[in-house]
């Protein structure tokens, strides 16, 4: 597919610090956070004017699912927009709590684990053709996804019985299966539940569960862009070496804990390769494919360059060439400098706080955003792009139809029902409009409905 629909679903960690008032459970804080949403949407599960979905997931985790995007920069802008939307909700919840005598502080974190050992996810969605064997696609992708943490991990200080260690990935120690139709119970690498949110005759949705939430825009580009390139290669029928792993769940943990990239992975055929070997195999295949077929979008040269530089940096042990572009390397540089200046070890509570605050979505408090403001974290999209994406849907996908409908219905105070594929006014006997083509941003049926609303 030269054009593909992408989406990212992000679950956020929530916390409340209250030195002078009674503590609040995360569930209570989440209710304050969503009170404004419930007041206008009559639900904690709503679609917004930018085409995205905002809701409370299992327990107390706010979740933001981007609108359908067909460009990687567009995807990153809309993912970033979710942070701004939720940060605004934090400010309003903070004011409401203060009015009720609660003087603590609400925090939202774009990370994947909390201090109690709970994990919450960042899920990627890729539209793929229905034709072809899904099991074969999963077999080819899983070795890549197990080792992708080298280039796209968010980094984490991991507490072990032998002391603290720095790991590539936050999510790796919480994955329990290769493929599964469940997302919370078994936490697979790839979710196989067949919900395309599109015409099921032609499309399927690849739902990747294993990734970390990225603060870095270039890390997010690398995470999604590499999968897109490998999918194109598979769709073109390129033959890949058999790199199925004997035990991908054990391997994903061992790889995460070894920053040299040389952790050995035993393959199902008995061979042993390092994580770096496996990543280089995919990189070389993709590079050859692009050399033969050309780059299908303007982001491909940067994706290939950063992929190469990241693997080279891991192999050499010198991450200075990537420490403004790859989350784990940005975070490690930050921590190494802080430990050196303050004579601390990795198991210091101050380092644990630094690890957490890196993921604070507050533009005023969050350490990542302080680094970004100083030019120490590379940008791909402008702040104007992000602010535009808070209100406006992507103009080139089905999200435009949904966003325009939601906006008009809200402006006119009309009662409506909407999801990824359906649009309906509840206060008249209109037939539900079914939008099964996610690439279609113009639809005369939707135009007629909007015109009829006045």
From Swiss-Prot:
Q: Which family does it belong to?
A: Belongs to the Pup ligase/Pup deamidase family. Pup-conjugating enzyme subfamily.
Q: Which domain of life is it from?
A: Bacteria
Named in its record, the pathway it takes part in is: Protein degradation; proteasomal Pup-dependent pathway; Protein modification; protein pupylation
What's the source species for this entry? Paenarthrobacter aurescens (strain TC1)
Q: What else is known?
A: The reaction mechanism probably proceeds via the activation of Pup by phosphorylation of its C-terminal glutamate, which is then subject to nucleophilic attack by the substrate lysine, resulting in an isopeptide bond and the release of phosphate as a good leaving group.
GO biological process terms, alphabetically, are:
modification-dependent protein catabolic process; proteasomal protein catabolic process; protein pupylation
Residues that hold Mg(2+) according to the record: 9, 55, 63
Q: Please give the function described in this protein's UniProt entry.
A: Catalyzes the covalent attachment of the prokaryotic ubiquitin-like protein modifier Pup to the proteasomal substrate proteins, thereby targeting them for proteasomal degradation. This tagging system is termed pupylation. The ligation reaction involves the side-chain carboxylate of the C-terminal glutamate of Pup and the side-chain amino group of a substrate lysine.
Q: Where does ATP bind?
A: 53, 66, 420
- Put simply, this protein is called Pup--protein ligase
Q: State any single GO MF term.
A: ligase activity, forming carbon-nitrogen bonds
